[in-house]
């Protein structure tokens, strides 16, 4: 019986010391990306770039609305074949316009995702460096835990290192087909 207690005591001491000796840190990756000044500037540049296309899209949309109104007004004047031809032409133009809008949205969503991935890769490099320099065994994202001490949060440390980097965040302009 004493041997069982001794083995149990040794077992608990050996494994509990391993568990409690791990150093854990918390980082808010979402905040690091969203609050990065270079990222914010790049997103603003993208929005400015999008504006020139949005103006063209509004013009095209207005032209399509006018064309639809003209078709409605000419129903009494034109033959059924001519109306069907105009409707078919309108539907083709509307379809092309919708495809262009979808491509536009998809393009800029992908560009922002690529930019965020570049920043994330830099954050991961900084986290690896931080973990090695500070003997941190485990770094968790702030979305993967419920409650933790603020002393575990290294977001500000990583943010200051991230701000020192000169990130090259490029995006491609939208090209209509």
Language-model segments: what does each one mean?
Residues 15-21:
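Sec/Tat signal peptide C-region and signal peptidase I cleavage site
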Residues 14-15, 129:
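Short, flexible, glycine/charge-rich loop motifs used to bind or transfer phosphoryl groups or to couple energy/partner
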